[in-house]
Each structure stands twice: as C-alpha cells, then as structure tokens.
C-alpha cells in the first residue's frame, strides 16, 4: 500500500483564512487523475503548523470522504499527547495510515524519541510511517532509533528527508528483515532513493505534476531506469523552483497558476517574491502545465 508517488497535499484557504473545502476536493481530484498512489493531508506542505485541532481533523475528514486512493494523514506533533489525539481521530475517520513527524523544537534524546513513537503505536492500531526532516525539526533521527522502531509491529516505514542517500541505504540494510518501507521526503532524491531500495516518495511536486511524478516512480520501481531518468531530468528544474522559497509558498502559487485552488497563505508565511515567481512561471510553462 505504501509505495509510489503520494502528494503531501496543499491545504487551500479562502482570502479570509478559512479552509477552502471545495478547493481541497478539487485539488484531490486533480492529483488522483494524475495517477498518484495515495494522498497525505496535514503535513508540512499542508501548513499543519497553522491549523487548529478542529481544522486538522476537518481536513482529514474531507480527504477520507472524497479520496479514491489510500489516505496517509499527518498526525505528528512535538506534544506526544496531541499527536496521540490526532492519530486516534485519523484512525476513527478511516485513514489507511498516519505520518508522524519527529518531535520538533524540544529535540528529545534517543530515549525520548523511542518512548514518543512507541506510546502512540501501542495506543492506536494503525500503520504508522515515521517522518525524519532535520531541516524542520532541528535534529536528525539516529539510524539506531529508526531500526529499533522498525521492529514495532505497526511502525511500517519512514519518510526520509535528511538529504542523505547513504543514510537511506543504511536504514534499508539494517531493516531488511523487518519489511520496513522507506519513502523519499525530497522530490529531487526520489530516483536515487528508489535505486537503493526505496518504495516511492511523499512529494511536493506531485501536487503540480502528479502524472510525471507517478510516471517516474512507477518506471523506477519496475526497473525501467532509462524512462525514470528521462522524467527525473525533465522535472528537475520545476522541483528546484518549488523550493526557491520555504515550502509550501511556491507550491501553493504554482497550484493557483495552473488553475487549482487559491494560493493564499496563512501568516507567518507570505507570498513569494516577484523574481522567484517569474522563475516558477518559466518552469511551469516549459512543462506545458501553464499556458
């Protein structure tokens, strides 16, 4: 179930900062038409940090209600109790799995990381994917912590965004007997990560070019690296443009530019600069996704 290209969904907002429910449904339909294998609401790209608890639950409810593909909901927090609350709600809502970010800001030691994830896994019987993103959390989850957690029955994988293919290789090497899934957390490293045994990507770019991301991942998983490399190099300039500023600022603007929901952001995120928007437009036009 947890393989392929899965967009980390954008959460569209109205101009008065409310959740754009119809926009969210429209965005989900768009990525599904592009062939994605699942969707991931309430992650970094979904501006989960500025969603209230009720909004967080509402976004997950909408995703489950309208999705035709598996839903993996972001339910992590730097507060174990809150992460547990979000995870219980997501399980009750009918998601297929949850994504749990490593606690951020408070930077727990290895014992704290193990206790945090084990407490949630023991309390809620649902497949769980860890999320290691040091650029956001302030710490890189150690390989030995990951391999210990891989032995917990319902911790089934990790989204790895440390930027190290070597680390991914080490995780796969040390969890080879645990049926543990590694998903890329960086669009640009998806192909190399699949080449060492990764199963796919939780992707920002799949919000904009779901067909191309799905095509690249599908080809790579089948061993057709010639086709996968061709798509990888085709979309690489757009991927770079989507990270000219803090994610999801460019991704939301790109979605708006190609006719999806509004790119309105919640503070403290602000619109991208005119110069960077011009670069983004150039890449969207090159790929033919924007007229």
UniProtKB/Swiss-Prot annotation:
GO function terms (MF aspect): 2-dehydro-3-deoxy-phosphogluconate aldolase activity; 4-hydroxy-tetrahydrodipicolinate synthase activity
UniProt keyword list: Amino-acid biosynthesis, Cytoplasm, Diaminopimelate biosynthesis, Lyase, Lysine biosynthesis, Schiff base
GO cellular component: cytoplasm
GO terms classed as biological process: diaminopimelate biosynthetic process; lysine biosynthetic process via diaminopimelate
Annotated coiled-coil segments of the chain: none
Site (Part of a proton relay during catalysis): 44, 105
Sites where the protein binds pyruvate: 45, 202
Catalytic activity, as annotated: L-aspartate 4-semialdehyde + pyruvate = (2S,4S)-4-hydroxy-2,3,4,5-tetrahydrodipicolinate + H2O + H(+)
UniProt KW Amino-acid biosynthesis keyword: yes
Pathway named in the protein's UniProt entry: Amino-acid biosynthesis; L-lysine biosynthesis via DAP pathway; (S)-tetrahydrodipicolinate from L-aspartate: step 3/4
Residues forming the catalytic site: 131, 159
Record-linked Pfam families: DHDPS
SMART domains, per the entry: DHDPS (SM01130)
CDD domains in UniProt: DHDPS
The enzyme's E.C. designation: 4.3.3.7
Record's subcellular location: Cytoplasm
Family, per entry: Belongs to the DapA family.
Subunit structure: Homotetramer; dimer of dimers.
The protein's role, per its UniProt record: Catalyzes the condensation of (S)-aspartate-beta-semialdehyde [(S)-ASA] and pyruvate to 4-hydroxy-tetrahydrodipicolinate (HTPA).
Name of the protein this chain belongs to: 4-hydroxy-tetrahydrodipicolinate synthase
UniProt source species: Methanosarcina acetivorans (strain ATCC 35395 / DSM 2834 / JCM 12185 / C2A)
Organism classification: Archaea, Methanobacteriati, Methanobacteriota, Stenosarchaea group, Methanomicrobia
